[in-house]
């Protein structure tokens, strides 16, 4: 009996403490915070984020409580933005207040203590590395000059699919390998020798680094930090990545130049590292972090978008007929497609826009509000974690007719760009933190897709119908397909 009473006292005491801590944290918040669901002591709204993808679950919350809603993730007060106006205010009107990134365990470990560009804090280091990226590495001019790499690798892929005509092929695997080779030749100056290892490292690390860690959500708990086993797995993954990148960097130092003697990304970064005029020194970790950015954001996302576009076209035969017809009419008699020609393919570019709307490369854009701000009439406290639900905004029925339907023709009536000016469609973000590799990524999507539609008719394997195509998304930063896309290539325009 005494033991039972003791346990009751302990449980009541713990619950009382947790409730008091919640009330203390709530008392520190401004009065006019965004609305949110009822929360539980200590864990807040974590129980509402089980059993689905975060962007889907958070959309359900904002549909019920409004496009600007707060969620309490453990100890962390967070705000979800799921409307074009809220995104516009955060990314344009109040951009300096929302240009920072919050750093969690996954990004700190896998992105080299935020010395990269994607997860870097908004500071002099970020400004410097972004300037290098935009002016020296991934400018539109440089992207065009690298067209021969895309042509080489796509020619190899086309030949591979020609050799498999009439047979089911794993399109997901082959496109991922091709995009990886394109990116590695740009980054390293040559193709990666152990490409499958690199692809597996990138995909596995992205999976492990996505999602919520309890140690992140309860930063005051040393015990949860100690017991965060995924943290140790991430460090082991980081060690494997270090070993891989160190080997390539050392090999690159020996070669001292990229293909045909020109500068590649590593050459430029090494040159900048030696520049005594740099405001913030570029470290070896900074170089590795940038290279990891290029692969994680450039390989997985570009390949995923091509595959989503092919998946959607296969589900809608009338769209599949229209897209190749435009490409073939425009490029009649040619054996390859370059970036200049792709820019003239209006319907193909609408197909890419629509794939990016329904399946954005980064479904959730993380930001950090660095000073108290007002968004759509609500007060956002300083140091609030912001989650901009790009996936939800792209499916908002207020701005999109039949929002869940793949319809590239919609852009004939209301043309929208994807470079951050139209906040109904922001797959690459907007404002200061817009993706610096935007032009590089689009080139690696549009050119391969045009080639695939120009040379082949794509059919489903025997016994499958459009309704059988699995469109399930997988957990991850880039929202990829859960299962591989299997299609049958039928040659339409042979390469020889």
Curated annotation (Swiss-Prot):
The monoterpenic phenol thymol is widely used as a fragrance and a flavoring ingredient in food and cosmetic industries. Its derivatives have also several biological and pharmacological properties such as antimicrobial, antioxidant, anticarcinogenesis, anti-inflammatory and antispasmodic activities. Medical applications include the treatment of disorders affecting the respiratory, nervous, and cardiovascular systems. It may also act as a growth enhancer and immunomodulator. The monoterpenic phenol carvacrol is commonly used as a fragrance and a food flavoring ingredient and preservative. Its derivatives exhibit also various biological and pharmacological properties including antioxidant, antibacterial, antifungal, insecticid, nematicid, anticancer, anti-inflammatory, hepatoprotective, spasmolytic, and vasorelaxant. Phytochemical inhibitor targeting the main SARS-CoV-2 viral protease (Mpro) and ACE2 in human host cells, carvacrol is a possible candidate for treating COVID-19. GO terms for cellular component: membrane. Its cofactor is heme. Pfam families: p450. It is found in: Membrane. Induction: Accumulates upon root colonization by Myrmica ants (Myrmica sabuleti and Myrmica scabrinodis) concomitantly with jasmonates induction; this leads to the production of carvacrol, an attractant for the phytophagous-predaceous butterfly Maculinea arion, whose larvae initially feed on Origanum vulgare flowerheads before switching to parasitize Myrmica ant colonies for their main period of growth. Slightly repressed by Spodoptera littoralis, an herbivory insect. It is an enzyme of class 1 (oxidoreductase). GO terms for molecular function: heme binding; iron ion binding; monooxygenase activity; oxidoreductase activity, acting on paired donors, with incorporation or reduction of molecular oxygen. Pathway: Secondary metabolite biosynthesis; terpenoid biosynthesis. InterPro entries: CYP450_71D, Cyt_P450, Cyt_P450_CS, Cyt_P450_E_grp-I, Cyt_P450_sf. The chain crosses the membrane at residues 1-21. Heme binds at residue 435. Its EC number is 1.14.14.-. Expressed at low levels in flowers, leaves and stems. GO terms for biological process: defense response to insect; response to insect; terpenoid biosynthetic process. Involved in the biosynthesis of phenolic monoterpenes natural products thymol and carvacrol which have a broad range of biological activities acting as antimicrobial compounds, insecticides, antioxidants and pharmaceutical agents. Catalyzes probably the C3-hydroxylation of gamma-terpinene to produce thymol. Keywords: Heme, Iron, Membrane, Metal-binding, Monooxygenase, Oxidoreductase, Signal-anchor, Transmembrane, Transmembrane helix. The keyword Cytoplasm does not apply. Belongs to the cytochrome P450 family. It is a single-pass type II membrane protein. It comes from the Eukaryota. This is Cytochrome P450 71D179. It comes from Origanum vulgare.
């Amino acid at each position: 009996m005494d033991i039972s009473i003791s346990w009751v006292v302990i449980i009541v005491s713990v619950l009382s403490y947790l409730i008091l801590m919640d009330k203390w944290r709530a008392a520190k918040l401004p009065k006019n915070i965004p609305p949110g669901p009822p929360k539980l002591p200590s864990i807040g709204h974590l129980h509402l984020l089980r059993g689905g993808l975060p962007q889907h679950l958070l959309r359900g919350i904002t549909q019920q409580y409004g496009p600007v809603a707060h969620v309490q993730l453990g100890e962390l007060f967070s705000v979800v933005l799921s409307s074009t106006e809220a995104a516009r205010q955060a990314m344009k009107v109040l951009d300096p207040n929302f240009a920072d990134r919050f750093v969690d365990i996954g990004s700190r470990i896998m992105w080299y203590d935020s010395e990269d560009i994607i997860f870097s804090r908004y500071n002099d280091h970020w400004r410097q590395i972004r300037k290098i990226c935009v002016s020296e590495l991934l400018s539109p001019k440089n992207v065009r000059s690298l067209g021969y790499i895309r042509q080489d690798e796509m020619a190899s892929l086309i030949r591979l699919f020609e050799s498999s005509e009439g047979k089911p092929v794993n399109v997901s695997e082959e496109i991922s390998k091709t995009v990886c080779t394109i990116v590695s030749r740009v980054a390293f100056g040559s193709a990666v020798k152990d490409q499958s290892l690199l692809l597996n490292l990138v995909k596995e690390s992205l999976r492990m680094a996505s999602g919520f860690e309890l140690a992140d959500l309860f930063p005051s708990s040393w015990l949860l930090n100690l017991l965060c086993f995924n943290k140790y797995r991430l460090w082991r993954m980081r060690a494997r990545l270090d070993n891989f990148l160190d080997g390539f960097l050392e090999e690159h130092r020996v070669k001292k130049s990229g293909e045909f003697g020109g500068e590649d990304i590593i050459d430029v970064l090494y040159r900048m590292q030696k520049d005594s005029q740099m405001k913030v020194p570029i470290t070896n970790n900074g170089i590795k972090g940038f290279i990891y950015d290029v692969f994680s954001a450039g390989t997985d996302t570009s390949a995923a978008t091509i595959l989503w576009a092919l998946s959607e076209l296969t589900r809608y035969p009338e769209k599949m007929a229209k897209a190749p017809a435009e490409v073939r009419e425009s490029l009649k008699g040619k054996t390859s497609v370059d970036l200049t020609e792709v820019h003239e393919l209006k319907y193909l570019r609408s197909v890419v826009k629509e794939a990016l709307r329904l399946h954005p490369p980064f479904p959730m854009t993380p930001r950090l509000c660095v000073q108290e701000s007002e968004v759509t009439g609500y007060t956002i406290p300083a140091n609030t974690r912001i989650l901009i639900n790009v996936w939800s905004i792209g499916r908002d029925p207020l701005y999109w007719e039949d929002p869940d339907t793949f319809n590239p023709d919609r852009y004939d009536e209301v043309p929208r760009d994807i470079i951050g000016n139209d906040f109904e469609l922001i797959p690459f973000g907007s404002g200061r933190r817009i993706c610096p590799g935007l032009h590089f990524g689009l080139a690696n999507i549009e050119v391969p897709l045009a080639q695939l539609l120009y040379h082949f008719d794509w059919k489903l394997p025997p016994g499958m119908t459009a309704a059988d195509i699995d469109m399930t998304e997988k957990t991850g930063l880039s929202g990829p397909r859960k299962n591989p896309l299997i299609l049958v290539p039928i040659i339409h325009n042979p390469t020889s």
